[in-house]
Amino acid sequence: MALLQQEKQEIIETYRLHDTDTGSAEVQVALLTSRINQLSQHLQKNPKDFNSRRGLMMMIGRRKRLLNYIAKRSPDRFRELAERLNIRVKK
């Protein structure tokens, strides 16, 4: 269910801003998006797993807060990140 270390490292390398970046908002959003996608697939197979559904809603909320932070700080980076991750955003 959780991300494998190798998958996590690939995501970090793809979305990092510099060589030692592991925790920037962009990296956190990318990691959360990957976990959200995995959990969504799990919930399609197991619709009565309400604890996982709650966890999914919490992850979506955390990702939304991070995206709002990025949008306020740098709208250009926000649009680029949303496009790369295929995240729908309000216009």
Swiss-Prot record:
Keywords: Ribonucleoprotein, Ribosomal protein, RNA-binding, rRNA-binding
Family under the similarity heading: Belongs to the universal ribosomal protein uS15 family.
GO molecular function annotation: rRNA binding; structural constituent of ribosome
Residues spanning the signal sequence: none
UniProt subunit comment: Part of the 30S ribosomal subunit. Forms a bridge to the 50S subunit in the 70S ribosome, contacting the 23S rRNA.
Biological-process GO terms, alphabetical: translation
SUPFAM superfamilies: S15/NS1 RNA-binding domain
Cysteine disulfide partners in this protein: none
Listed Pfam families: Ribosomal_S15
Gene name as annotated: rpsO
Keyword Secreted assigned: no
NCBIfam families attached to this UniProt entry: S15_bact
Domain of life according to the entry: Bacteria
Any one of the GO CC terms: cytosolic small ribosomal subunit
Keyword Ribonucleoprotein: yes
Protein name: Small ribosomal subunit protein uS15
Record function comment: One of the primary rRNA binding proteins, it binds directly to 16S rRNA where it helps nucleate assembly of the platform of the 30S subunit by binding and bridging several RNA helices of the 16S rRNA. Forms an intersubunit bridge (bridge B4) with the 23S rRNA of the 50S subunit in the ribosome.
